[in-house]
Regions:
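PLP-dependent class I/II
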Residues: 1-252
């Protein structure tokens, strides 16, 4: 297990470990960990911290409310954190910008979980200091909107309906893209849900330029292309795989 081996390596060299997990709807692949994978990860962390080694699990859950499995499945994963050893600090990084589609406001929150109050007492001032010195304050408008929607029953119910509609729309776009990819023979990395689908590519920069000439914009990364299905229509999701495949095949 590569994660387990890396944790052991860092534990020896650093005497402490920080692990960042972006799940569900991983950016950029759309991979999502199963409940069994989360159980295995918790076991690995507990094994590494049996001797009291300080460990921080930073859980980047920016896209958590777009998991196609629904609310209960994602919260069931989080409840596993109760099994973590005392030397583990779990930090949940929530993005209101994603969940509530408030991208321009960049609003989010951190929730720290630990079995020892002393760990939280140490984390809180350090967190406040680092956040205030780097970013000052979150926007008042963003904080107001999040609290207003979540604390007002009428708004909250309407929001839940809109969120479900957005999630269903993403699922439909993803299914269309993946189905068409199979038809044209375009390979994609394992995808479950999310805003992005990733296509393996040996020359991403060259393929990106070819696609731009056809007014198609994807993001070239290392050995892959990231397709943002959150930003394109259902019809475009059906059309893109063929265009991307043609652009990639020019290198063959």
């Amino acid at each position: 297990n590569s994660v387990q081996n890396k944790i052991k390596e860092l534990k020896i060299s650093q005497k402490r470990v920080v692990l960042v997990i972006n799940d569900p709807c991983h950016n950029p692949t759309g991979y999502t960990m199963s409940y069994e994978e989360w159980q295995k990860l918790i076991d690995i962390i507990n094994e590494a911290t049996e001797d009291g080694t300080p460990f921080v699990l930073l859980y980047d859950m920016a896209y958590i409310d777009y998991d196609s499995r629904g609310f209960e499945a994602t919260r069931k994963n989080i409840r596993l954190f109760q099994k973590l050893n005392a030397s583990v600090l779990a930090i949940l990084a929530f993005s209101g910008s994603k969940t509530m589609a408030l991208y321009g406001l960049r609003i989010g929150a951190q929730v720290a979980l630990a079995k020892e109050q002393s760990v939280i007492d140490e984390f809180t001032p350090a967190n406040v200091f680092s956040a205030r010195t780097k970013w000052s304050m979150a926007t008042n408008l963003g904080m107001h909107l999040v609290s207003k929607v979540l604390l007002t029953e009428e708004y909250c119910k309407k929001f839940e309906i809109e969120l479900k509609q957005a999630s269903n729309m993403l699922t439909a776009r993803a299914n269309a893209f993946l189905e068409e990819s199979k038809k044209v023979g375009l390979q994609t990395l394992p995808f479950m849900c999310g805003f992005f689908i990733t296509v393996p590519c040996k020359n991403p920069d060259a393929v990106y330029k070819r696609l731009v000439e056809r007014k198609i914009h994807v993001i070239p990364l290392e050995n892959v292309l990231r397709v943002t299905i959150a930003a394109i229509s259902l019809e475009e999701c059906k059309r893109l795989p063929k265009e991307i495949k043609k652009a990639i095949d020019k290198d063959l």
